[in-house]
A protein has these predicted regions:
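Conserved HRD-motif arginine in the catalytic loop of eukaryotic-like protein kinases
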Residues: 14
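Accessory alpha-helical DNA-binding modules that contact the DNA backbone or grooves
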Residues: 37, 61-266, 273-275, 286-287, ...
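Short, Lys/Arg-enriched N-terminal segments with co-localized hydrophobic residues
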Residues: 25-37
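Charged, compositionally biased N-terminal leader segments and the immediate start
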Residues: 35-59
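Core AdoMet radical
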Residues: 403-404, 445-446
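Charged catalytic cores and adjacent phosphate/nucleic-acid-binding surfaces used
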Residues: 36, 227-378, 386-402, 409-439, ...
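Tryptophan (W) side chains
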Residues: 3, 7-9, 25
Length: 607
């Protein structure tokens, strides 16, 4: 007779006697066929992760400790663990009960463990990754997840930047600083680094080399000279007769480690563990500088152009110049190919040579072109500096206006402003305007774009602001069509001035949400809206590749620091890098306008 019940494949019912002599039945595990022989460390790691996942879920500590103890037991085994599991003898070990033995049997018998996979699926995947951060145990991870909605390492790092952890119970400033430092350490181990985390150290190394004996000149080259947002190596080109003198100078600098020399090359690691590659050349010729800067794609296109023009051209990637036109500068090298000088930031092999050939390359925007800055937070929401301090800092940097834009009411995690606090802040700005000269102060808001594309204030509230930045801060996982429609609907709102951090990405940490940015840029053109280049070095969003499309469509950008402290105002320089890589001129960046011209240019309906 069949009852329609599938009995587990690795269990059987056997008779046994109870303590009082009664005949009863019990379930026992039987031997299993091994699908894949597993190392004890593999099995222990899975058990350890199950313990972590249970802690992250807030399960009974006894339950998670059982898995931790089992992991330690298995890792200490000298016998073949797979054989012990397959034979059922694993139950002889202390702490391995029937339920756990059955899970281990499933693991080696099928190559997977349903319980483990279901546990992982029940939690955001980024939570487990965060356990690798020093100082971030399961309790703290659970706290930032439940209190701040943080589910990835990138979001956690950005929350540290925004100073949002200090107010959580059990955290504080020191803990926040330690967490941020730990995240950086993890990223370094993975081999990629934010430009902003590298450039300061790289410039110090170059300065030390320049002051070394016998050195004529030294320049950053490669990814850093091209100002890529993410880099792997600090590459330096040095003009000197003896590589040994350069090596000695680096040794005297201190902090560099694993320094070694092979011929004209010196390698090592910076104090932060970033690979350093120094090439010493007797003469830093234009040919060598061009080649060391790259990119490979750009150099390849130059070589192809030279071949078509029948010009001798054979620059090698190992910096051994075999054949090239005579030139005393990079400008002269490009001129030999009938081209104007191409700025290093543009040399990515993405159409810059064709643009130069047809006269489309214009002078790029410079940091000094920026007249004022939008997207600045204060202590009214999640900033760490007061309104007064942010204005004073912006003025000291030479800006002629600053736009204050704290978070809106939906951003509860960031102390977003309800309508009464909007009125309170506006009154404070009015008072500050009266006692401040030399800088204009604009009233703004970073308003959440709700999932349906509506803004989280009614129009009568939005009308009170000088500018409105619309940003997505929730529901990142919407399908592409829905996310795109959501953002486009926000751009149609007559009170929205610009789109903030348009893809939501966090470099090296979180991919942007699925969105058709070309359609969004087209919509910005139709509604005459500005798109932000968020200059925070963790974002740099709009990406420079998309800046090129915005340029083609005639859509202007605003380079905004997204500052949450006074030092964050200085991030504008990183946004300028993005704009330059995107080929943007000063006239294509809206905040190169002065204070009298900027608000009309933002097309707000009440100006």
């Amino acid at each position: 007779m069949s009852w329609g019940i599938a009995w587990p494949w690795n269990r059987r019912i056997v008779p046994h006697s109870s303590a009082c002599g009664e005949r009863r039945w019990r379930v026992e595990s039987v031997g299993v066929a091994v699908v894949r022989k597993m190392d004890k460390r593999e099995i222990a790691k899975i058990l350890e992760e199950i313990g972590l996942l249970l802690e992250l879920k807030g399960e009974n500590p006894f339950k998670s400790n059982a898995y931790y103890n089992a992991a330690r037991t298995i890792e200490s085994l000298t016998d073949d663990v797979t054989e012990l599991i397959a034979s059922g003898r694993i139950r002889d070990l202390k702490g391995i009960g029937l339920a756990l033995a059955e899970k281990l049997a499933e693991l080696v018998g099928t190559g997977r463990l349903t319980y483990y996979e279901e546990l992982k699926q029940s939690l955001p995947p980024g939570l487990l990754e965060m356990t690798a951060i020093p100082g971030m145990g399961p309790k703290k991870i659970r706290a930032v997840w439940e209190k701040l909605g943080i589910t990835t390492m990138g979001e956690l790092e950005y929350a540290c930047v925004e100073n949002r952890l200090v107010s959580l119970p059990g955290f504080g400033q020191k803990t926040q600083d330690k967490i941020r430092q730990g995240i950086r350490q993890l990223k370094r181990r993975r081999g990629f680094h934010l430009y902003a985390n590298v450039i300061g150290e790289a410039e110090r190394i170059v300065e030390v080399i320049r002051h070394s004996a016998e050195v004529r000149s030294a320049e950053l080259v490669g990814e850093l000279r091209r100002r890529l947002e993410v880099v792997q190596t600090i590459s330096v080109l040095v003009s000197a007769d003896r590589p040994q003198s350069v090596l000695e100078g680096l040794r005297q600098m201190g902090g560099l480690w694993e320094l070694a020399r092979a011929g004209d090359r010196i390698i090592g690691k910076s104090p932060l563990g970033i690979p350093v590659a120094v090439v010493v050349s007797e003469d830093m010729s234009a040919h060598v500088l061009l080649t060391a800067t790259g990119s490979e794609e750009h150099l390849s296109e130059l070589a192809a152009r030279a071949a078509r023009m029948k010009i001798p051209w054979n620059l090698t990637s190992d910096l051994g110049v075999k054949l090239a036109p005579k030139a005393d500068s990079e400008e002269a090298l490009y001129a030999a190919l009938g081209l104007p000088f191409i700025e290093p930031e543009l040399r990515e092999g993405l159409g810059e040579i064709e643009a130069a050939e047809t006269g489309l390359l214009k002078p790029l925007v410079e940091a000094w072109h920026i007249q004022g800055i939008f997207h600045n937070h204060t202590t009214y929401s999640d900033g760490s500096a007061s309104l007064d301090d942010m204005v004073v800092a912006a003025k000291s940097l030479g800006y002629r206006y600053i736009g204050i834009s704290d978070h809106s009411q939906s951003a509860f995690y960031a102390n977003g402003l309800k309508e009464d606090r909007v009125r309170e802040q506006h009154a404070a700005i009015d008072g500050l305007r009266k006692r401040t000269s030399g800088i204009a102060i604009f009233k703004g808001i970073e308003a959440d774009i709700l999932p349906d594309g509506m803004m989280d204030y009614p129009d009568e509230v939005l009308a009170r602001f000088d500018f409105v930045i619309g940003s997505v801060h929730s529901r990142f996982n919407l399908p592409e069509e829905e996310q795109t429609a959501r953002v486009i609907r926000a751009l149609v709102n007559p009170y929205v001035t610009m789109l903030g951090h348009p893809t939501g990405r966090l470099l090296l940490s979180r991919e942007g949400y699925r969105i058709d940015m070309k359609r969004v840029i087209d919509a910005a053109k139709q509604s005459d809206k500005v798109i932000e280049i968020n200059a925070n070095p963790h974002r740099l969003d709009l990406d420079w590749r998309l800046c090129r499309y915005a340029k083609e469509q005639g859509v202007k950008v605003s380079i905004n620091p997204d500052a949450h402290a006074t030092d964050g105002l200085e991030d504008v320089a990183f946004g300028v890098n993005v704009a330059r890589k995107g080929g943007l001129e000063a006239s294509e960046v809206v905040n190169t306008l002065g204070p009298d011209d900027i608000l009309p240019a933002l097309s707000a309906p009440h100006h």
